[in-house]
Curated annotation (Swiss-Prot):
MF GO annotations: glycine hydroxymethyltransferase activity; pyridoxal phosphate binding
Subcellular localization: Cytoplasm
Superkingdom of source: Bacteria
GO terms under biological process: glycine biosynthetic process from serine; tetrahydrofolate interconversion
Pathway of action: One-carbon metabolism; tetrahydrofolate interconversion; Amino-acid biosynthesis; glycine biosynthesis; glycine from L-serine: step 1/1
Source organism phylogeny: Bacteria, Pseudomonadati, Pseudomonadota, Gammaproteobacteria, Alteromonadales
NCBIfam families, alphabetized: PRK00011.1
Pfam families: SHMT (PF00464)
Protein name: Serine hydroxymethyltransferase
Organism from which the protein derives: Shewanella woodyi (strain ATCC 51908 / MS32)
Keyword set, alphabetical order: Amino-acid biosynthesis, Cytoplasm, One-carbon metabolism, Pyridoxal phosphate, Transferase
Catalytic activity: (6R)-5,10-methylene-5,6,7,8-tetrahydrofolate + glycine + H2O = (6S)-5,6,7,8-tetrahydrofolate + L-serine
Name of the gene this protein is made from: glyA
């Protein structure tokens, strides 16, 4: 018999300790991985609810199981809030991840072997935008565009040239490591010129878009996907949106999610998405996103002042790439040294990187998590100077230890969950 006082600590102390250690790590380390964030206790409450017990294959009002009247409400709330948040006429909140949302779009709009045009992973794209190691590059004919080596920005002339040459059935706009603002309208012009669908993956900037401080792709794209974590600060999951008022495409998308790619949806996660969307509709969410950009720009500026190269010379969003080629430091070594100082980043390839993706010559740095715990511009600048101190001499154990102690003091002043 199940009892409410059952707990992990008593039953599984090894797992409980791992959870406690991870909680401590999050509190005592500064998180600069651009795709990570801290979700609210309200989201955690919904995700840990009894809704995890309910199977609900299908969609609200059209389930294959009985007893779905309450989870239907949760999903309908998530759908309506997602539509309101992004100005959509269609929303599917069931994808378990951003990659599965992207896979559903491919399944709905393409046939195997169709040509797709997406951003190269080496230039800031995502695995699911046509990389040869992903389904998107294995099952479809993938053509890749990149950024201008001089400006660090998307080369729209190249995108158009490739589109005219290869006649893709779908063009993908979006990124996992690009610090500029994308001209969605220009992408749509190119797509219309060659008769292609425009598919936007806004996973990294969804929170900025929801707050109105980054251009919304919904008026331009046929289909838009996103994750629900990252800048949106919700649970880990995916979302598909559209505003083209095309019921035929909506039905194809729904069928591609279920039964095409998934079975039963995760109702506890969908409930958590509903909470996160409601949070994103609050005024303070806009203030948070504005600070995210301010902090990222302050960090990029400080790195440049300290003699480091930033791809494209700065950032217009929440992330930027630190190019370490001129410093003869690998991304792998920089990642490790900063990790010893309780600063978590991720090694990342930079444009025309001479090193392998397992070593790299750069770091991807993002500000959503530090801003979530309350950092303002002053703390962002202070932190960046500490990082430069470490990177200036990555084998100096004394410097690493000093910075680690400074990080611990700063984290104590700005707890994740105060």
């Amino acid at each position: 018999m199940l009892k409410k006082d059952m707990n992990i600590a008593d039953f599984d102390p090894q797992l409980f300790q791992a959870i406690q250690d991870e909680t401590r790590r999050q509190e005592e380390h500064i998180e600069l991985i651009a795709s990570e964030n801290y979700t609210s206790p309200r989201v955690l409450e919904a995700q840990g609810s009894q809704l995890t017990n309910k199977y609900a294959e299908g969609y609200p009002g059209k389930r294959y199981y009985g007893g779905c009247e309450h989870v239907d409400i949760a999903e309908e709330l998530a759908i309506s809030r997602a539509k309101e948040l992004f100005g959509a006429t269609y929303a599917n909140v069931q994808p378990h991840s951003g990659s599965q949302a992207n896979a559903a779009v491919f399944m709905a709009l393409l046939e195997g072997g169709d040509t797709v045009l997406g951003m190269s992973l080496a230039h800031g794209g995502h695995l699911t935008h046509g990389s040869h190691v992903s389904f998107s590059g294995k099952l479809y004919n993938s053509v890749q565009y990149g950024i201008d080596e001089t400006t660090g920005k998307i080369d729209y002339a190249e995108v158009e040239r490739l589109a005219v040459e290869h006649k893709p059935k779908m063009i993908i706009a979006g990124f996992s490591a690009y610090s500029g603002i994308i001209d969605w309208g220009k992408f749509r012009e190119i797509a219309d010129k060659v008769g292609a669908y425009l598919f936007v993956d806004m996973a990294h900037v969804a929170g900025l878009i929801a707050a109105g401080i980054y251009p919304n792709p919904l008026p331009h794209a046929h289909v838009v996907t996103t994750t629900t974590h990252k800048t949106l600060a919700g649970p880990r999951g995916g979302l598909i949106l559209s505003a083209i008022d095309d019921e035929a495409i909506y039905k194809k998308l729904n069928s591609a999610v279920f039964p095409g790619g998934q079975g039963g949806p995760l109702m506890h996660v969908i409930a958590a998405k509903a909470v996160a969307f409601k949070e994103a509709l609050e005024p303070e969410f806009t203030a948070y996103q504005e600070q995210v950009v301010v902090n990222a720009q302050a960090m990029a500026k400080t790195f440049i002042e300290r003699g480091y190269d930033v791809v494209s010379g700065g950032t217009d969003n929440h992330l930027f790439l630190l190019d370490l080629i001129s410093k003869d430091i690998t991304g792998k070594d920089a990642d490790a040294a900063l990790g010893l100082a309780n600063i978590t980043v991720n090694k990342n390839s930079v444009p025309n990187d001479p090193r392998s993706p397992f070593v790299t010559s750069g770091l991807r740095i993002g500000s959503p998590a530090i801003t979530r715990r309350g950092f303002k511009e002053a703390q962002a600048v202070e932190l960046t100077n500490w990082m430069c101190d470490v990177l200036d001499d990555i084998t100096n154990e004394g410097t690493i230890e000093r910075v680690k102690n400074q990080v611990l003091e700063l984290c104590a002043k700005f707890p994740v969950y105060g």
